[in-house]
Amino acid sequence: MNEELIQGGLHTDARGVLRFCNDFDMSAVKRFYTISNSAEQPVRGWIGHKKETKWFFPLRGRTEIGVESFGQDLQDGQDFGFRVSSSECRVRINEENAKGSSARFILNANEPKVLKVPPGNWFKIVQDGNAEVMVFSDCKVGEFENDDFRREL
């Protein structure tokens, strides 16, 4: 899986709170966005990329991120039931042979860390209450055509 957890820090004084992650090298980042799931649907995923790297940084609350490596068939690019949705430009995956090893990470805004999820992995985001996470990507929208994979929860 090769995911990486980059330690950050927190400084509080009379002026307020400073959250940081000074060891996060952002030279590969090309865009960013934030995610805050709705109370009705606190789970988002499974989403996978063969080429794109994602980094996650907690802005507010607690976010759990499950990471699972692609199964060997998907890594090898074998067709085992891909269904392409041209309207969404996403590939939907047949569940069998799609999974590999897995890990779970808890990101909390009060304990700043950056989670790196390299290509070749699925991720799932579960958020509590009003949690919000910032996501960084190493590609522009549309840069890697057909690199957006979906799996059932």
Where are these regions (language model features)?
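Non-catalytic, conserved peripheral segments adjacent to functional cores
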Residues: 1-71, 75, 100-111, 130-153
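Surface-exposed beta-strand edges and flanking loops
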Residues: 7, 86, 93-95, 109, ...
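Intrinsic disorder/low-complexity segments
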Residues: 69-103
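Conserved metal-binding segment of the jelly-roll/cupin
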Residues: 107-129
